[in-house]
Amino acid sequence: MHCLVTSTSIKLTAPSDTIDVQYCSDYFEKNNKQKPKINLPKLPVGLAELRALVKGGFKANDLKLQHVLAYLGHLLQDIKGELTEDWTSFGVLIGNRSHNITPLDLLDVNYYDDKLLDGVKANDASQSDDAWMLFACLGIYRLARTQNLQHRSSILMKMNAQILSLNQNAIKLVDNTMFYNSWISNYNYTKLIAACDMFFYKFKDHEHAVCRFGTIPSRWKDCGGLTSLSHLKNLTGMELEEIVSWVFVPSIGKEICRMMKSGQELDKPDSYVPYMMDLGLSMKSPYSSSANGGTYTWIHMIGSIMHSQRSLHARMVNENELPNIRISAMLTAYVKFNKGSLMKVFVKEEDKHLYIGEDQDENEGNGSDYIDLTQHPNTDSADDWYQWLEINNFTLDDIIKDSITRECKKIQNTRAGTIGSYIQTTLS
């Protein structure tokens, strides 16, 4: 650019501190397809004494993470599942068909000698305590990740109910933010959590699968952009191909292309990829809400207008291109809220010949051959509506605006800093 005042030419630049996203596949390529590494303390005591220290820690509300890691390192060796097929992910062989594996087999475990920290021992600890203490030790992860005090209290109440169902003589868990909140910053603890959830997701009928109550937030952690696509798919009934056809904002298109990079096992349920963050496979998720702020905001604006509670509570993480994203979201929500895609599903047996061979979807969801661009399209086709929007200079008419306003006025009690609050205050 040239400045007329100073008669100089300048190059316009803006500061940037963004970190490139890291894909799961890159980790395994750089590490010769080795399992994620974890370091666990090797203490000069056996399982019985560790069990006593963990139970004593629960009693005294002074549980040491070192004791928990060593205890889980022992206990998880006896939690096994038999594979019905070879289990591989990113070229890593996790286990062979018909073999028994444990959660630790998902990791490359390094045991290191460590000095035993002092702790309170419970003299009445026994093997019967293992089930509830395993649940509690893993459940602390979910508790620690919950910052909202009301929700945290609810989680704790549910945890204690489950603990008592596992053992009526179990010790009720007491929240200790000073200790527990620091646990989720310990890479070895979070790697154990991820390995356990990945194992119990694979073996859904395992007797200890109930432990997923505490570990489930590890699955798809920091993948809010990607999981929001699934949310919109479920909310609207649209397939992903149709969803992306409604993307009219170029920056959102770039985000979706980046998320859909091939070779990442996104469609493989038992892959390492849902646990990439807690397993330390990526420093910055390519699927997070912050890395895909436009997509995340667009989807949850649509969801908020359609009164989805999940969308209403979604955090407002993006302020870039808000005018374009808002217009695009309003149009998509209007069409999908007011135009259904219905078909005849059941008929009487004697009438089925009237329907067999009939192409019921002949005109459903497809662009029409001709539309009057001065009127709203009579289809729910993204192509038709984009043509209408383009011919109207990308401006929504009063019919659409009034319809959206009526819906947004029904929204109540949103939390500050959420997309629901933004929709309520700007569109109602």
Swiss-Prot record:
GO terms for cellular component: helical viral capsid; host cell cytoplasm; ribonucleoprotein complex; viral nucleocapsid. Its main location: virion. InterPro entries: Rhabdo_ncapsid, Rhabdovirus_ncapsid_C, Rhabdovirus_ncapsid_N, Rhabdovirus_nucleoprotein-like. It is found in: Virion; Host cytoplasm. Pfam families: Rhabdo_ncap. One of its GO terms (molecular function) is RNA binding. Gene3D superfamilies: Nucleoprotein, Rhabdovirus nucleocapsid protein like domain. Keywords: Capsid protein, Helical capsid protein, Host cytoplasm, Ribonucleoprotein, RNA-binding, Viral nucleoprotein, Viral RNA replication, Virion. The keyword Ribonucleoprotein applies. The keyword Magnesium does not apply. It comes from the Viruses. Homomultimerizes to form the nucleocapsid. Binds to viral genomic RNA. N in nucleocapsid binds the P protein and thereby positions the polymerase on the template. Interaction of N(0) with the P protein prevents the uncontrolled aggregation of N(0). Encapsidates the genome, protecting it from nucleases. The encapsidated genomic RNA is termed the NC and serves as template for transcription and replication. Nucleocapsid assembly is concomitant with replication, therefore viral replication depends on the intracellular concentration of free N, termed N(0). All replicative products are resistant to nucleases. This is Nucleoprotein.
